[in-house]
Amino acid sequence: MILYTVMPQEIVFAEQNQETSAHEQIEYKGVPLLVEMKGNEAEVIQIMSTNPMHFLHPDISPGQKLKLNV
């Protein structure tokens, strides 16, 4: 991606850098997910799998909350 801007890179990508620090990559039922941890719950942010069949599971779609046994 090429950005033609006079703004510094730190300002353009500031929000992106802050979000990744709160996210964690886990494997849930064999599917790699990027989640935001909140106690023993995880909110799915992104499915990191390359298998297209994993994107058809409604229980792991982005925005869903997963109960994790710690």
UniProtKB/Swiss-Prot annotation:
Pfam families: YlzJ. This is Uncharacterized protein YlzJ. The lineage of its organism: Bacteria, Bacillati, Bacillota, Bacilli, Bacillales. InterPro entries: YlzJ (IPR025619). It comes from Bacillus subtilis (strain 168).
